[in-house]
Amino acid sequence: MEWKLFADLAEVAGSRTVRVDVDGDATVGDALDALVGAHPALESRVFGDDGELYDHINVLRNGEAAALGEATAAGDELALFPPVSGG
């Protein structure tokens, strides 16, 4: 499964794309756990002290908003977007 990372999340991980291995019945949350396991510095950027995903982090599956409990399928593209502002 491939994650696309944007803005400071890509900088922290050292790459805009990260492949993770997950079981066939994995959820988006399982894939996110695998991503954070491979890149522990991401944990404080996406999860609060309570272990919950920050409200300002957007998780997408195949270009659509995704819940962490949502099932994944082979070939899915997942993405993490931090808040983005511009001027």
Swiss-Prot record:
<feature type="modified residue" description="Glycyl adenylate; alternate">
    <location>
        <position position="87"/>
    </location>
</feature>
<dbReference type="GO" id="GO:0032446">
    <property type="term" value="P:protein modification by small protein conjugation"/>
</dbReference>
<dbReference type="GO" id="GO:0000166">
    <property type="term" value="F:nucleotide binding"/>
</dbReference>
<dbReference type="GO" id="GO:0006777">
    <property type="term" value="P:Mo-molybdopterin cofactor biosynthetic process"/>
</dbReference>
<comment type="function">
    <text>Functions as a protein modifier covalently attached to lysine residues of substrate proteins, as well as a sulfur carrier in molybdenum cofactor (MoCo) biosynthesis. The protein modification process is termed sampylation and involves the formation of an isopeptide bond between the SAMP1 C-terminal glycine carboxylate and the epsilon-amino group of lysine residues on target proteins. May serve as a proteolytic signal in the cell to target proteins for degradation by proteasomes.</text>
</comment>
<keyword id="KW-1017">Isopeptide bond</keyword>
<dbReference type="InterPro" id="IPR010038">
    <property type="entry name" value="MoaD_arc-typ"/>
</dbReference>
<dbReference type="InterPro" id="IPR044672">
    <property type="entry name" value="MOCS2A"/>
</dbReference>
<protein>
    <recommendedName>
        <fullName>Small archaeal modifier protein 1</fullName>
    </recommendedName>
</protein>
<dbReference type="GO" id="GO:0031386">
    <property type="term" value="F:protein tag activity"/>
</dbReference>
<dbReference type="InterPro" id="IPR003749">
    <property type="entry name" value="ThiS/MoaD-like"/>
</dbReference>
<keyword id="KW-0597">Phosphoprotein</keyword>
<feature type="cross-link" description="Glycyl lysine isopeptide (Gly-Lys) (interchain with K-? in acceptor proteins); alternate">
    <location>
        <position position="87"/>
    </location>
</feature>
<dbReference type="Pfam" id="PF02597">
    <property type="entry name" value="ThiS"/>
</dbReference>
<dbReference type="InterPro" id="IPR054834">
    <property type="entry name" value="SAMP1_3"/>
</dbReference>
<feature type="modified residue" description="1-thioglycine; alternate">
    <location>
        <position position="87"/>
    </location>
</feature>
<keyword id="KW-0547">Nucleotide-binding</keyword>
<dbReference type="InterPro" id="IPR016155">
    <property type="entry name" value="Mopterin_synth/thiamin_S_b"/>
</dbReference>
<dbReference type="GO" id="GO:1990133">
    <property type="term" value="C:molybdopterin adenylyltransferase complex"/>
</dbReference>
<keyword id="KW-0833">Ubl conjugation pathway</keyword>
<dbReference type="InterPro" id="IPR012675">
    <property type="entry name" value="Beta-grasp_dom_sf"/>
</dbReference>
